């Protein structure tokens, strides 16, 4: 799997070089970079927008997609700059047509930074804008994710169950299934959650979103540990380690699992909670894995108090960045 991922990244980099050398911008290649290598996409973006020969539509698409990439990579300067560019007169008609999508991407930026109230504010703005049934469904998924992170999973679950899954393309089904997995696990239904996560990974793979496959698989790891299914745990972990940035982003949660599994595989009757494990439990909770850590504490009778999510707002964005597209709020 690691060799396969390296091959995929090689193809993406070659696509990046082609993107930068062509007389016209290959928007499809750029969008693929945004999906699978957002940091590389932003490097390409900064090179491409310096060109003087770009058509207005191509330049608009670069700014629009840069918002998506920077939302995921916490690159606030580019996020704000690209949004400001979308407000410029040459792009007004195009931006007005994409109002729901732009507001959604802004909401994703806030949610990634744990500014969940701002995320919901922008998603609800987007719900009031003209959009397809599919996009409205995606918005419900995003709103549900934000409510789940605010420890209100029941609200999120009810929203998710109102979505007609069969009407959605594969990549949207993947997002819906991931959100359902998170909500159902938070409500205490581990087996159902695992089924959702596995199904989501299959849909992400169909969409060639390999990073998302690994991200949702991280959620499955904790359930495999709950079930003492260490074979599946180690197999999935080996796949995830092919994406170093995911390891870094989830280091406390993965550290918690590693320490726990090491003891469980030794068949100890009473597990020892080290200072390191305590630190990992708090870090994992703050990264959004409180319900998973608490499930492990209960399952394995760990001498550790339950943890709560103290979500840290990471690199916060200014509020209401989408106000220009949401004048009535």
Roles of regions detected by a PLM:
Residues 28, 65, 98, 105, ...:
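"A position-specific structural signal for the A-helix of alpha-solenoid helical repeats
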Residues 46-50, 84-91, 124-129, 161-166, ...:
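Amphipathic alpha-helical segments of tetratricopeptide repeats
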Residues 61, 101, 138, 175, ...:
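Residue register of alpha-helical TPR repeats
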Residues 17-68, 72, 80, 326-327:
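N-terminal leader/linker segments that initiate helical-solenoid repeat arrays
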């Amino acid at each position: 799997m690691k060799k396969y991922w390296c091959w995929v990244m090689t193809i993406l980099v070659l696509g990046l070089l082609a993107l930068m050398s062509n007389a016209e911008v290959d928007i499809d290649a750029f969008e693929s970079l945004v999906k699978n290598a957002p940091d590389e996409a932003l490097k390409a973006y900064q090179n491409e927008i310096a060109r003087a020969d770009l058509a207005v539509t191509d330049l608009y698409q670069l700014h629009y997609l840069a918002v998506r990439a920077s939302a995921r990579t916490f690159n606030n300067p580019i996020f704000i700059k690209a949004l400001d560019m979308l407000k410029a007169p040459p792009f007004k008609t195009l931006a007005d047509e994409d109002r729901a999508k732009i507001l959604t991407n802004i909401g994703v930026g806030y949610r990634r930074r744990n500014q969940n109230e701002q995320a919901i504010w922008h998603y609800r703005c987007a719900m009031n804008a003209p959009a397809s049934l599919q996009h409205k469904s995606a918005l419900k998924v995003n709103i549900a994710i934000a409510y789940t992170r605010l420890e209100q999973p029941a609200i999120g679950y009810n929203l998710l169950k109102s979505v007609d899954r069969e009407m959605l393309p594969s990549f949207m089904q993947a997002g819906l299934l991931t959100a359902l997995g998170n909500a159902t696990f938070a409500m205490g239904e581990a087996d159902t959650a695992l089924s959702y996560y596995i199904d989501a990974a299959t849909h992400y793979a169909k969409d060639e979103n390999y990073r998302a496959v690994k991200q949702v698989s991280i959620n499955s790891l904790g359930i495999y540990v709950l079930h003492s299914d260490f074979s599946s745990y180690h197999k999935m972990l080996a796949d995830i380690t092919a994406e170093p940035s995911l390891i870094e982003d989830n280091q406390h949660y993965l550290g918690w699992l590693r320490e726990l599994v090491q003891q469980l595989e030794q068949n100890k009757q009473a597990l020892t909670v080290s200072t390191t494990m305590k630190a990992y439990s708090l870090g994992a909770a703050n990264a959004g894995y409180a319900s998973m850590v608490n499930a492990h504490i209960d399952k394995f009778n760990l001498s550790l108090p339950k943890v709560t999510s103290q979500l840290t707002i990471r690199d916060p964005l200014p509020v209401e960045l989408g106000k220009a597209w949401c004048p009535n709020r």
